[in-house]
C-alpha cells in the first residue's frame, strides 16, 4: 500500500496528521520559505508526543541549496542533533554551483546521519541532470527522493516521476508538490509508492485585538493573523483513497 507522508509545521499539526492516518511526518518550520529546520524545542516536543515516524527537514535558510561554509557547519550540527534525539530519519539536500549534487558535502551529511534514513528533498527539482543526480544519490545511500518531477507540481511532472522510478538502482521516489485528494488517484494508478502532501489550510488567528497598521514580516502585504495548519479531514480522506485503491 502506498505510504502517506504529511508535511507539518508544528507539534499540533504532527498530532493531527498522526490521528488521521498519516504514515510519516516531515517536520518543518517556515511554510512561506518552503520549509526550514525546526527549533530544538519543537523537535523535542514532537519526539516526545508523536509516535509515527517523523523526519525533520535540515535546511538553514530559504532560497537555493548551495550553502556557505557557515551554513553547512550548521547543517551538520543539526543532523547530529536530530540523530541524538532519536529521530528515524531526516530530510536535506545540497547542490554545488553547477546544479549537481555536492558529493563531498553530502558524504559528510551521510556520515553524520549514520543509520538514519535520509530523504533528498526538492533540491532534486533544481538539479541540472536528474538522471545523473539519481545515480549519485543511489551511490550515497539516500533512502528516498522527494520530487515534483522538476515541474511546479507533481501532477505536471508525473511522466518524469515515472521515468525516475524506472531508473536502475533508484532510491524510493516520493511524489510531492500539489498532491491532494482530488488528484491522488493519478499517482496511485501510476504505481507511485510514497506520496507527500501538506494537506493543509490557512487558519485564522484566535487574536481579537489586531494592529493592522504594521507587519512583522518583510512582506508588507503578508497576513499576520493566519497560519498554515494540517487539515485532519484532508489527511483522512487521502488515507481512505489509498486504502480503497489497495483493496481493488
Curated annotation (Swiss-Prot):
Keywords: Cytoplasm. InterPro entries: CutC-like, CutC-like_dom_sf. The keyword Cytoplasm applies. It comes from the Bacteria. It is found in: Cytoplasm. SUPFAM superfamilies: CutC-like. Belongs to the CutC family. This is PF03932 family protein CutC. It comes from Shigella boydii serotype 4 (strain Sb227). The lineage of its organism: Bacteria, Pseudomonadati, Pseudomonadota, Gammaproteobacteria, Enterobacterales.
